[in-house]
Amino acid sequence: MLNKFFKTIHNKYSRFFKFIFFLRYLFAIFFVSISLFLIIPGFFNYEKKEKLIKNYFLESYNLKISEYENIKYKAFPIPRLEFKKTRINFLKSNANFNVNYLQVYPKIFSIYNLNNFEASKIILKENDVNLKTSNFYTFINEISKLRKKIFFNDLNIKIINDDKLVVKLE
């Protein structure tokens, strides 16, 4: 009796169980391929491609990266490039940024193709900015006119006039 009951259940739902077991393998393949797609760029040498990234900053944001300590790629939770201890110059306003952490979030397909590099957003963390009083207005205008996303975390602004500190905003 028990054997008959087991056979009827097995025969009745066998197509459903086969489909569920097939989905299990399909999800495993999908998960492995996505994780490999995100992890493999961590082995690339971004020091060789620095000119392409610097050129993108210059064209899109009017930012000139003059110095940095190193570039690292981090895949999780969101793929990003991290520059440490970076010195950046705003070209039109002559503002000098000293940034401890510059995070660039590239678009998904521009992780592999750095010739057509595009970033979805940029985060500047722990910034020190030195501005002259004459360049303050142009600096504010340039930041407000940017079409691409740029975020500042922990921004310290020093406004200087004739080598004297006028205002320090933290």
Q: Regions from the language model: what does each represent?
A:
Residues 42-51, 56, 69-165:
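Flexible beta-edge/linker motif
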Residues 1-61:
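N-terminal type II signal-anchor transmembrane helix
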Residues 26-30, 64-65, 87, 157:
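Aromatic-enriched hydrophobic runs in primary sequence
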Residues 62-70:
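A short, amphipathic edge element
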